[in-house]
Structure formats: C-alpha cells, structure tokens
Amino acid sequence: MLSGCYGGSRPANIGTAAPTFTVQDSDRKVSLDELRGKVVVLNFWATWCPPCIEEMPSLAQMQQKMKGKGVEVLAISVDADQGAYQDFLKEHKVDLLTVRDADQKSNNLYGTFKFPETYIIDRDGVLRRKFIGAIDWGTPEIQDYLGKL
C-alpha cells in the first residue's frame, strides 16, 4: 500500500447508508443516487497527489474489466484548479466517470482525511469498505470482492 496526501473530517461508517451527494462541475452533474443498483467504487483524488496519480491506471483497468459486472468507478477530484484537472484528464486519457468538487463537499461527507481515499458502496447504497492510500485494483482479491457485491 502506498502513502497518501492529507485533508478531511469525520468518517462515514461501514455498514451504514453511504452519504449521498450531487456534484456539479463545468462539464457535468453527477449524483451518487444515479448509480444505485451498481457497485460503486468512490475514489477521492487530486492531480497534486502522487499516490492518486499512480493509482489511476489501476482504477481504469479495473473499471474496464468489471463494468459489465455492474461495477462503476466514480472518481471525484478535489482540485481547486480546473485547468490542472482538465489538463490531467486529457494528458492521461482518463476513461472513468470523473467530476471535480473544488469545494470538497462530497469528500467531507465521508470524512476523507487522506488522498487517495476510496469507498466501496454496494448495489443497495450501503458503505461496505474503505481504502486509504493507493492500492492495486487489479488483484484477484479485490476483483472477486467487487464481483460478489
């Protein structure tokens, strides 16, 4: 496991309903409720966070492999700088559902204190797992776990 970059507040509780939110940035509006019925891999990240950048290809590969099984990655950037965010997406050809929450309202609902921080939400909207720091999303253990939710 890799280290992360610090931020945050109170944590959301595993086994309880995942806090819902809607994020509107310049390109799109995304609501967690829209993803109900899917397993959501909710990833909070930033372009200024080296472990976040290192983790991104692994997330994208897992998404490509697991999308047909009802798994959706929602990657929320906490970048204040819209230009840096847009440039990063283009430069790295990020092929994930991403949105920028510069005010950090969504990650504050989860008490995110380190980036990247990732939450697994089941098809019923229940928070099942939390990962702090970058992980390898390609491991059989992770993919088996996601496939069983």
Model-identified regions with their sequence ranges:
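N-terminal targeting signals for export/organelle localization
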Residues: 1-22, 140-144, 149
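Hydrophobic beta-strand core positions in alpha/beta domains
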Residues: 41-43, 75, 119-120
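Conserved segment of the thioredoxin-like fold in thiol-based oxidoreductases
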Residues: 54, 64-105, 112-115
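Thiol/disulfide oxidoreductase modules built on the thioredoxin-like
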Residues: 87-94, 102-147
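Conserved redox-active cysteine motifs that mediate thiol-disulfide chemistry
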Residues: 44-61
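A short beta-strand-turn-helix
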Residues: 20-40
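Short pre-active-site segment immediately N-terminal to redox-active cysteine/selenocysteine motifs
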Residues: 38-40, 44-48, 114
